[in-house]
Design a protein with these regions (language model features):
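Alpha-helical protein-protein interaction scaffolds
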Residues: 1-62
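Boundary/linker segments of alpha-helical solenoid repeat arrays
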Residues: 8-20, 90-99, 110-112
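Structural detector for internal amphipathic alpha-helices that build alpha-solenoid repeat scaffolds
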Residues: 31-39, 63-73, 95-106
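Amphipathic alpha-helical scaffolding segments comprising HEAT/armadillo-like alpha-solenoid repeats
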Residues: 44-53, 75-87, 109-116
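Structural recognition of alpha-solenoid helical scaffolds
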Residues: 47, 62-65, 74-81, 95, ...
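Short coil turns that connect the paired helices of HEAT/ARM alpha-solenoid repeats
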Residues: 55-58, 88-92
Length: 218
């Protein structure tokens, strides 16, 4: 209504500033109301779908969509359900890592036991770092950043691969491998993509290719 009055120039000049403030307030109230309604819709959807067994029956891409919905709401009421999904080995490693990252971002305190690739680790999201904040990831990234400083195209591609692999493997890093050896194997991995084949550490390359396969979300 106020906007219509402005458009039709029915508000006196001396009153326009006051009415503009009212108009802005009304817009904020409407926006907040829409946001609350949106959050309620998401919460209703999540309560319906986020049973572990039902979740496992969904295609991975649909699971990913549901996980993205979680980023828009307070996930503390769902922390026990999320814990169960993260600890379920049948849930895709990438999905489990994303759920864990959401708990970290919202600083949710709960003890979780994660097993991947024959390794197991207990952690509390409220006290944990995100995948790309882990020390060995940073070391490998810095080595490769220096090496590909003059080749931004390859470096951009490598950054994307590195971050995807770090998320899928999370909360595990490259132990027992040394960061320099991992970085060198990533260089060889990139060279193979361009048709250049060299000798490499088979165990590290196997891990890289496994992570690459898992990143396809099939």
């Amino acid at each position: 209504i106020i906007e219509t009055l402005f458009n039709e120039q029915m508000i006196p000049i001396e009153q326009q500033e006051k009415f503009q403030r009212i108009q802005e307030l009304n817009k904020r109230i409407a926006l907040n109301k829409q946001q609350l309604e949106h959050e309620k819709q998401i919460e209703s959807l999540l309560k319906e779908q986020m049973d572990v067994n039902r979740f496992l029956n969904l295609p991975v891409m649909e699971q990913l969509i549901l996980v993205q919905q979680f980023s828009e709401v307070n996930i503390r009421p769902y922390k026990n359900m999320l814990k169960g999904m993260i600890e379920e080995d049948e849930v895709h490693p990438f999905i489990r890592s994303l759920l864990l990252s959401l708990l970290i971002e919202q600083e949710v305190s709960i003890e979780i036991s994660v097993s991947k690739f024959g390794m197991e680790k207990k952690l509390n999201p409220a006290e944990s770092k995100l995948p790309t904040e882990l020390p060995q990831y940073q070391e490998i990234r810095n080595i490769l950043a220096e090496r590909y400083d003059q080749n931004p195209t390859v470096w951009e591609m490598l950054q994307e691969v590195l971050s995807k692999h770090a998320i899928i493997a999370y909360p595990f890093e490259w132990t027992p491998f040394h960061s320099v050896d991992v970085a060198n194997t990533y260089v060889q991995y990139v060279n193979e993509m361009f048709g250049q084949f060299e000798e490499h550490d088979c165990d590290i390359m196997k891990r890289i290719k496994l992570l690459d396969h898992l990143s396809e979300l099939q």
